[in-house]
């Protein structure tokens, strides 16, 4: 099998952001981008790997030559576009189909192996590009259109299976003055080629400094669990039981799990690449530490703080007098049936050193607890109107794992009276743990 890599670009955006290494030699998880591709191609049975590099960064060619890989063929060419770089490879590609990718395309190896068996053009629903090439497909999975404007179900993943007849179309495009790969792809459709799309969950490009951390996180099999302080659990073990259940499921999926508490979390624990951090932390110092974490944190510190700021209500009695961050004691939430009880509850909290207090409206009706993880898990699932209102609130606060309490009045009106980050999911812990583990892996 023949593979080809376009590695002749300048990487100007990365250079502008202070990255000195040429793009092919940028390391993801300790491995150069070009080395990673070559290793994967060889493991997939490559008998020829053709790479085009430019003359402006001779260290790339020198690095490739140092690999002493007999399957590797190097072309040096300074080209104005990716189409011209592909054309420079044409003389050494031979007369067989080949798989083409750019040097900065990052994917999971298992996804790539399935692509080789089943697809022609890799596509992904994951959009993280400034100017993605949107793709429409038909019911059989064949590409019907390449579009500059979305949305469409997929965007191009930058991995293509091409044939010698397709290279003739490339030559025609260049002779017409075309320079962009997306126009070459459109020309293939216009020429009647049937291009079978292969969806891959996520494919990343390294265009900016921040993309390096994204790629390392994407490929990492390490997940850190941060347990909530007993200060915020009211002495109950439910929170720890939930996070432990999530950790067991992730271990079964071959993730390496490490654990700490919000009191013992250190910056050093966040230095290695992490697929994500599942954090129940609420301590302000811990949230400040996590705010500087380069890896995905679920829930984000900003969202946790948003959840803590429940409201600025000052409702008259009858009402609920609440501590306006996190309840640590039963007396942090008090029902006041009249104004005297309301004032007494406020004064009692102030006497305990609590200054941030809200008085929340009391609503008559049926109280319901609800739980959510992302957009795909919600309990109780028999209340679609509550689900929509809860999802809207979660989006406003930026929460990914959430829950709370609502009152449903006799007229059907829904009032959300409490909304929290990382509830215990006590009534549905096992199924919630599966949903949270899925969200941790896929972050959707």
Residue ranges and their predicted role:
Residues 1-19, 193, 220-228:
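N-terminal nucleotide-binding beta1-loop-alpha1 segment
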Residues 3, 155-222:
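Conserved alpha/beta core of the MobA/IspD/sugar-nucleotide pyrophosphorylase nucleotidyltransferase superfamily
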Residues 60-137:
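Conserved beta-loop-beta/alpha segment of the NTase-like Rossmann-fold superfamily
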Residues 82-83, 130-134, 319-345, 366-369, ...:
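Glycine-rich phosphate-binding loop of ATP-grasp-fold ATP-dependent ligases
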Residues 107-182:
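Conserved core of the sugar-phosphate nucleotidyltransferase
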Residues 153, 334-397, 408:
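Phosphate-binding site of ATP-dependent enzymes
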Residues 220-222, 395, 399, 408-444:
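C-terminal active-site "lid" helix and adjoining low-complexity regulatory extension at the edge
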Residues 229-318, 326-327:
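Conserved N-proximal alpha/beta basic substrate-recognition cap immediately N-terminal to
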């Amino acid at each position: 099998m023949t593979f080809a890599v376009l590695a002749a670009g300048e990487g100007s955006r990365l250079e502008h952001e202070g990255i000195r290494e040429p793009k092919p030699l940028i390391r993801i998880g300790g491995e150069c981008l070009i080395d990673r591709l070559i290793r994967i191609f060889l493991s997939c049975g490559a008998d020829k790997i053709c790479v085009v590099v430019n003359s402006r960064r001779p260290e790339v060619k020198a690095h490739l030559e140092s690999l002493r890989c007999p399957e590797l063929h190097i072309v040096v060419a300074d080209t104005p576009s990716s189409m011209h770089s592909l054309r420079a490879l044409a003389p050494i590609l031979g007369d067989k189909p080949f798989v083409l990718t750019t040097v900065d395309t990052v994917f999971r190896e298992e996804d790539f192996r399935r692509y080789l068996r089943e697809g022609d053009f890799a596509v992904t629903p994951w959009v993280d590009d400034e100017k993605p090439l949107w793709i429409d497909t038909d019911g059989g999975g064949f590409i019907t259109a390449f579009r500059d404007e979305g949305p469409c179900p997929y965007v191009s993943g930058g991995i293509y299976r091409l044939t010698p007849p397709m290279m003739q179309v490339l030559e025609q495009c260049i002779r017409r003055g075309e320079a962009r790969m997306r126009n070459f792809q459109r020309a293939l459709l216009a020429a009647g080629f049937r291009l079978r799309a292969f969806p891959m969950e996520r494919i990343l490009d390294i265009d900016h400094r921040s993309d390096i951390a994204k790629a390392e996180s994407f490929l990492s099999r390490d997940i850190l669990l941060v347990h909530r302080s007993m200060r915020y659990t009211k002495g109950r073990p439910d929170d720890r039981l939930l996070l432990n259940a999530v950790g067991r499921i992730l271990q079964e999926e071959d993730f390496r799990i490490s654990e700490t508490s919000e009191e013992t979390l250190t910056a050093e624990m966040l230095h290695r690449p992490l697929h994500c951090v599942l954090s129940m932390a609420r301590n302000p110092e811990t949230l400040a530490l996590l705010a500087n974490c380069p890896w995905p944190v679920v829930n984000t510190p900003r969202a946790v703080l948003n959840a803590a700021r429940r409201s600025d209500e000052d409702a008259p009695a009858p009402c609920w007098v609440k501590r306006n961050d996190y309840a640590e004691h039963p007396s942090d939430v008090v029902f006041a049936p009249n104004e005297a009880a309301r004032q007494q509850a406020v004064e009692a909290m102030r006497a305990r050193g609590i200054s941030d207090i809200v008085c929340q409206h009391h609503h008559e009706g049926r109280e319901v607890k609800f739980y959510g993880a992302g957009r795909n898990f919600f309990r109780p699932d028999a209340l679609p109107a509550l689900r929509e209102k809860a999802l809207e609130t979660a989006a406003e606060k930026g929460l990914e794992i959430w829950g709370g309490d609502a009152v449903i009045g006799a007229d059907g009106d829904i009032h959300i009276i409490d909304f929290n980050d990382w509830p215990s999911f006590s009534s549905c812990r096992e199924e919630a743990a599966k949903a949270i583990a899925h969200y941790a892996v896929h972050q959707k």
